[in-house]
Design a protein with these regions (language model features):
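Mg2+/Mn2+-dependent nuclease catalytic core
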Residues: 97, 104-245
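Amphipathic, positively biased hydrophobic alpha-helical segments used for protein targeting
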Residues: 62, 166-168, 249
C-alpha cells in the first residue's frame, strides 16, 4: 500500500484490539486453564485426531504472524468461542438454570497429568439424578455432522466424569474467585448447588451435548453417553501425546 494513503488511525485502533485480545486470552487462560504446559487437555487429544503434528506444534510453539491483520483474524476466531460461551451462559441463567462453568477434572494416568475442562455442567436430582455436559463450539458454518475430534472431546468428558465420579478430582473456580479443589462430583454439587447426587454414577442419567454456533444459527449434537467412549483409549492417547512432547527439545507449552 502507498504510504501516503495509509490510515494510521485505523491501523492503530486494530493494533489496540489485537494486543488487547492477546492479553485478555493470556489472563483468561491463566485463570481458567492454568499452565497448559503441565498437562494434557482433552482438546489436545481431540486435535490429534485431526492432525497430530499440528496438535503438538500448537503446544510447543507460539504462533508467529506476518502482519497485524493476520494476527487479528486468528485472535478473533479464537475469542469467538469465549464470546459465545458467555452468551450461552447468560441464556442458561435466563432460563432459570444454575450451570457449573468450567468444571475441571484433574487426574493422573501413570506419570501423565490430564485435565478436562467442561464448558457447562447442568445438574439436578429431581425427578431423578441427571447430569448434562454442554460443550460450546463456534463455527463459520454449521456442520452437517459433528467432527470426529469434537465427538471425541465430548465423549471423553462424559466418560471421565462417570469413571471418576466419586474420586476427589473435581475442581471449580467460583464467581468470587475462590477455588474448590479435590472434591468428588457429588460433594461439589452439594456444596455449590445444594443438589444431592448418588454415590454411584450408574444411578445417574449422564449425557453430553455439543452446541455449535455460527453468527446467525445454532445446531445441537447428541446425546453422547459415557459408554460410547473407551476411557482406556482416551488415556492412552493422552500418554502418547505427553511422551511425544516431553521427548522433544522443548517442554510442552
Amino acid at each position: 500500500m502507498d504510504g501516503t494513503n495509509r490510515n494510521t488511525g485505523a491501523e492503530g485502533l486494530l493494533g489496540i484490539l489485537c494486543c488487547g485480545l492477546e492479553r485478555s486470552a493470556e489472563q483468561r487462560t491463566a485463570i481458567q486453564l492454568g499452565d497448559r504446559s503441565q498437562y494434557v487437555g482433552l482438546s489436545d487429544i481431540a486435535q490429534m485426531l485431526d492432525c497430530p503434528r499440528a496438535a503438538l506444534a500448537g503446544k510447543l510453539y507460539t504462533p508467529e504472524y506476518r502482519s497485524t491483520d493476520e494476527a487479528l483474524k486468528h485472535k478473533i476466531t479464537f475469542h469467538r468461542d469465549h464470546w459465545f460461551e458467555r452468551g450461552v451462559h447468560q441464556s442458561l441463567i435466563g432460563y432459570g438454570l444454575s450451570p457449573l462453568s468450567q468444571l475441571e477434572i484433574e487426574i493422573r494416568y501413570g506419570d501423565v497429568p490430564i485435565k478436562a475442562h467442561l464448558d457447562f455442567t447442568l445438574v439436578t436430582d429431581q425427578p431423578q439424578p441427571t447430569v448434562r455436559i454442554l460443550e460450546v463450539k463456534s463455527t463459520a458454518r454449521l456442520p452437517a455432522t459433528l467432527s470426529e475430534s469434537y465427538a471425541m472431546q465430548i465423549g471423553g468428558q462424559t466418560a471421565l466424569l462417570k469413571a471418576y465420579w466419586n474420586h476427589p478430582v473435581f475442581n471449580i473456580i467460583q464467581e468470587t474467585g475462590e477455588v474448590l479443589y479435590h472434591r468428588t462430583l457429588p460433594e461439589s454439587c452439594q456444596e455449590l448447588l445444594d443438589v444431592s447426587l448418588p454415590d454411584d454414577a450408574s444411578a445417574c442419567d449422564i449425557q453430553g451435548w455439543v452446541l455449535c454456533l455460527s453468527m446467525c444459527d445454532a445446531k445441537a449434537f447428541g446425546p453422547f453417553l459415557p459408554e460410547d467412549m473407551d476411557v482406556a483409549q482416551c488415556l492412552d492417547m493422552a500418554s502418547e501425546f505427553w511422551e511425544t512432547g516431553v521427548t522433544t527439545d522443548k517442554p510442552v507449552s
